[in-house]
Regions:
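Core dinuclear metal-dependent hydrolase active-site scaffold
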Residues: 1-88, 154-238, 296-316
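Catalytic metal-binding/acid-base residues of hydrolase active sites
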Residues: 9, 29-31, 99, 125, ...
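Metallo-beta-lactamase
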Residues: 89-101, 242-246
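Active-site HxH/HxHxD metal-binding segment of metal-dependent hydrolases
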Residues: 92, 100-149, 263
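Extracytoplasmic/secreted cell-surface and envelope-processing proteins
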Residues: 101-105, 127-131, 135, 191, ...
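Short, surface-exposed basic-aromatic patches at helix termini and helix-loop junctions that form
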Residues: 107-116, 234-235, 258-261, 282-284
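Short acidic, glycine/proline-enriched helix-loop-strand junctions
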Residues: 127-158, 261, 276-298
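Internal alpha/beta domain cores that form substrate/cofactor-binding pockets in large enzymes
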Residues: 239-304, 308-312
């Protein structure tokens, strides 16, 4: 069993291989272009070298980081899947929420004959600003998957408290399956979130159990979501590994939730971010705060005997 947190730059992609052999992918990002927020932060952090490069027409890529003195190798999630799981379908693709940095390159799955069997989505009527052809292609593929012509893939819009065969139940109804628990969204608060216009708070917050390792995947959930989880779960919010919400930004950090979760490892997908970076706050509650940008791909493996390891692509 394995959970891989891929170094995809600004965005997310988590690939989980369950004991059943089924494959879950949570979000995908195969775009090497920086979004506006990250672009501004890179300029601030690296100064003139990045700022001058960013003025070149069409240059908004992670090549900026190399030019500014940071050597980084991003992982193409499509190539990762083809190399590590050749010929294998994605049994369960979960779109945490409908922001482009969590779905860029989605159309490349179909282009490389990687089929999605079940497509998890959230209820919304959000449409992002589409500023380039790559964004348009990814969004159009997302809409195609949501429509699910002829039932392929099967579209599921789950919420807190739901149960179902394969993801948290065995075919005979016994609890288990692939060990996925939905902590959020909650149907009681979904309308309020939709009305607020804060798409980040539509995020699936999932607790996935691999062997006995409890992993919380928090999407881009912000304070209001964490308030609800703290109120509803209390000390039952415990986990071993947390994938930090909103790429480790302050907006996704919640002090009481961290105290209750008390993870051994916190994984941040992006890395150090001036002004908005909450890594120092996470370290108050977790000794091991690992960024994919500095550590590369981060992989948790475990087996039925209870043996577990967590390793990174780069030892730094």
């Amino acid at each position: 069993m394995r959970a891989s947190f891929l170094n995809v730059g600004h965005g997310d992609c988590t690939v989980i291989e369950h004991a059943s052999g089924r494959l879950t992918v949570v979000d995908v990002n195969n775009c090497l272009e920086l979004d506006d927020e990250t672009l501004a932060e890179v300029r601030e952090y690296y100064g003139d070298s990045a700022s001058k490069l960013a003025e070149v027409p069409g240059v908004r890529t992670f090549g900026m980081l190399k030019e500014a003195g940071y050597n980084i190798e991003l992982t193409n999630p499509i190539e990762f899947l083809r190399k590590n799981y050749p010929g294998k379908d994605i049994f369960r693709y979960i779109q945490s929420h409908p922001h482009l940095d969590h779905m860029n390159g989605l159309e490349q799955l179909k282009a490389h004959n990687i089929e999605i069997v079940n497509f998890w989505d959230t209820e919304h009527d959000f449409t992002p600003e589409l500023t380039n052809d790559a964004d348009l292609a990814s969004w159009n593929e997302y809409k195609r998957l949501r429509r699910s012509v002829n039932g392929s893939p099967k579209v599921l819009r789950h919420s807190y408290g739901a149960s179902g065969t394969f993801w948290n139940q065995e075919p005979d109804g016994v609890k288990g399956g692939d060990g996925i628990e939905i902590l959020h969204p909650n149907r009681l608060t979904l309308k309020k979130i939709q009305d607020s216009g804060n798409v980040n708070n539509l995020s699936y917050v999932l607790r996935v159990i691999l062997c006995e390792v409890k992993i919380i995947l928090a999407g881009d959930a912000e304070k209001e979501v964490w308030d609800d989880l703290v109120s509803g779960y209390g000390d039952k919010l415990k986990c071993d590994v947390l994938k930090a919400s909103h790429h480790g930004r302050d907006s996704g950090f919640h002090e009481k939730a961290m105290e209750l979760m008390n993870p051994q490892f916190t994984i941040v997908s992006v890395g150090r971010k001036p002004e908005t970076d909450a890594s120092g706050r996470y370290r108050k509650y977790c000794k091991n705060v690992w960024s994919t940008r500095w550590k590369g791909n981060i992989v948790i493996t475990c087996d039925v005997s209870g043996h577990r390891t967590i390793k990174s692509q780069y030892d730094r």
